[in-house]
Structures are given as structure tokens and as C-alpha cells.
Amino acid sequence: MQPTQIILLIAVYFVVLILISYLTGKEDSNEAFFKANKSAPWYLVAFGMIGASLSGVTFISVPGLVEGQQFAYLQGVLGFFVGYLIVLLVLIPLYYQLNVTSIYQYLEDRFGKTSYKTGAFFFLISRVTGASFRLYLVALAMQYIVFESLGIPFWVTVVLSILLIWLYTNKGGIKTIIWTDTLQTIAMLTSVSVAIILILNKLDWTLAETFTKETFKNKSKIFFFEDVNSSIYFWKYFIGGIFITIAMTGLDQDMMQKNLTCKNAKESKKNMFLMSILLVVVNVIFLTLGALLFIYAEQFNIAIPELNGVTRTDLLFPEIAMNQGLGKGLAITFIIGLIAAAYSSADSALTSLTTSFSVDFCHIENQPIAAQKPLRKKVHVGVSIVLIVVVIIFNSLEGSVVSNLFKFATFTYGPLLGLFAFGILTKKTTHDKYTWMVAIIAILLTYFITLTPSYFPDSFIGNYNFHWEILPINGFITFLGLLMVSKKQTTSIDS
């Protein structure tokens, strides 16, 4: 496809998003922006959350995992399913009972202001870093595919991307996101489905035949129990997947804000249960595509792409979609799917960051009624500017530095996990002023634990490869730290 054609495609896509914004954002109130007036259809929220769960990185990378891991990623997905059940049974009833706008308001009720601010601050850091990282990767891809050849600087690409997101989230907020997420989920699934159909046609296979082919079986092993030191060992993936979901969905304002738009806890639970089933199915589809991509590449002698001399399996999907003669239809759906995957996570991040900062730090609900909407709009602009600056900073750093920053940001979910676990599982109160210190110490200790195999290979950890299980370890260290600074008396709050 020519760059001008891709730009036209992007323009049409955003016109549709802005039209949805116009139709859903007419009310332009804080209640609609933050909670969608608690009137969102639960089934729509469930379907749209699939798109929000699959970032642009996931859209490209999950199919690429098949080469080194086969279907091992599904072990983690099964953990996700269990994690969603825990969120459904424990956290959703709690949030609805407290009637919170920001889920971190629970921490103030349970422990005090320092714990509240600590939890909200760690969410802001992790979500700003995570959203910026994902936007950076997709903006980089779009710069390479389209804008570089037109002489458009990278910073312009970034500013335009975030400006477009600001335009369609400015009025409706989460009420708009519910509908745009649905559209973006459809776009992603269409892209993957078209790719599977076209590859099967080229291979002259039916879908039923695919699962009986030896070449497919050799790329689709799911369970790995052989090597406990391996990063794809079953219990690492499965247990890690449970805690990833609890922390990065149940304790994340971005993800939970959508669940809190449902009319009541019962409907929100139905939404979460349906979404957990759909997510398993969607990940099976993505991994199936991954296996077919590598089979197709082997059969037609397509080299796996390299970037800076490094083989990049996660670039095989865009390479085949854009350059390997499967037709303009696949190229079009791939571009739309990539844009949808990127912006479905970025737009909800912008909305949730605006919500968290407005509620948790500006205390918007305590402001005069006339000042509330202007304050929210100022915060929305401010968050947009922060995202632009961080993405541009990422572009000036070396790739390894950016990756390590993103990895370190994921450690901030450990203190959230520990804080909420301590609040829900115990009746103890803490010396609230020490919470921030406990959280920072937990992050640093966890980080040093992950470095142990590299710097101290003869230690008791040896050659152990840490994976997702580092999150519950981080949470456990936080839990122990809170226990050490807890008071003897019990809280009167029913938690």
C-alpha cells in the first residue's frame, strides 16, 4: 500500500471514532465521563474489554511467541481466567459496595491518606509509562511504514496521534470508550480472522484439517512441566497469570473503570465472566494465527524479519500482511487492526489517568459544581501533554533503556497487590505514614531478586528464570512490610 492510501485509511477510521464520540458525548458531564452514568450494557463492556486487554504490542507479539514457546502462553491465559473469577467474586462487590469513582479510594477508607495517595501514585506511574511505551512502539511502526517517507518528523506523528485520541475522548470519556472499544475489538478480530482465512487458502487447508496436520501439532504444545527453571514452566505461567489479572485488571483503574459503568454489581459480574471466556477464545485464535504464520513462512521460504541484526519473530505478522502477496484486503485489515489495538489501550489509559488524577489528587468531588467540569478538562489536556512528552523522551533513549523502564514500571503493581491483599485479608491497621516507604522497599528488593541469577549464579536461586511470578513475590514482600508497620488494634471498617 502507498503511504497516502494508509493515511486515508487512518483518517477514515478516526472520522468514525469522532462520530461515535459525537453521538455518545452529548451530555459532557463528569458523571458520564467517569462512570458512563452507570448505564453501560454489560455485554458491550465485556466485548469491548477484549480490545482494551490486547494492546498493539500484544496484537503483533502474541503470534510471534509461537516460534519459541509454541502455545505455552495459553498456560498464562488459563491463569487469567482464574484471576478474573477472583476479581469477580472479591473486588467487584467491594467497589460497588463503596460506590467509588476511583478504586484507590478504598485504600483511604481502609488505611488512610498516605496509603491512598501511594496506591494512586503507583497506578499513575505504571499507566503513564505503560501507555507511553505502547504508543511509542506503534508510533514508531507507523513512522516507519508511512510518515518517514513523507518527511514528517516523529514528534509530529506522536502529537497527532494523541491529539486524535483527545478529540474523541474529551467529552464522553468512559461513556465514549465503551463504544469505541467495541469497534476496535471488531477491527482486531477481523484482521486476525482475515489473515487466518487467507493463509489457509494459500496452504490449501481447511480449518478442521489444520489441527490434524503434523506441522501444526509441532507448533501447538500447550503444557510444559519439564523444567522448573524455564520461563515457560506451567506453574510459573499459570500462577503468574492469576496474579497478573488480579493486579493489572482488578487493581487497575484503567480496567476497572469500565466494569464500574455497569448498572450494578450483578451486571458487572456477568460482564467479567463473559469477558474471561472470550479472552481465552481470542488468545487461542491469536496463537493459531501465530502457528500458521510460521508454517506459511517455512513453506514459501519467507525469512523471519531482522531489525538491527536481531531476528524479530514479532515482526513476521506485519511482514506477511504487508509484503507477501496475500492481497490488499489483508494489508488494509492489518493496518486497521494495528491502529485499533494501539488506540484501544491508549484512549482508555488517557481517560483513566484523567479520572485518577482528578479524583485522587485534585479531589474533584469536593470542588464547587461549577468548577468540576473545567477542572476535569484541564486535567485531560495535562495528561495528554504528559503522554506526548514521555513518548518523545522514549524516542531519544536507547531501546534497551526504554524496555527496562517499561519492565520496572510493571513492578509498581506489586505494592498495589500487597496493599489490597493486606486490607482485604486482615483486620489490622497500619502506621499509614510508612506505607510509601514499604512500597518503595518492596519494589527495590524485588528488582534485586530478579538480578540474582545474573550476578550470583552460584546462589540458591541458581539459573532460575523469573517470569510473571515476580508479581506475587513483590506483593508478598509488600504484605510483610505492612505487617511489620501494623498496629495492634483492629480496624472498625468491615473490609
Predicted regions and their residues:
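Membrane-embedded helix-loop-helix hairpins and adjacent transmembrane boundary segments
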Residues: M1-S495
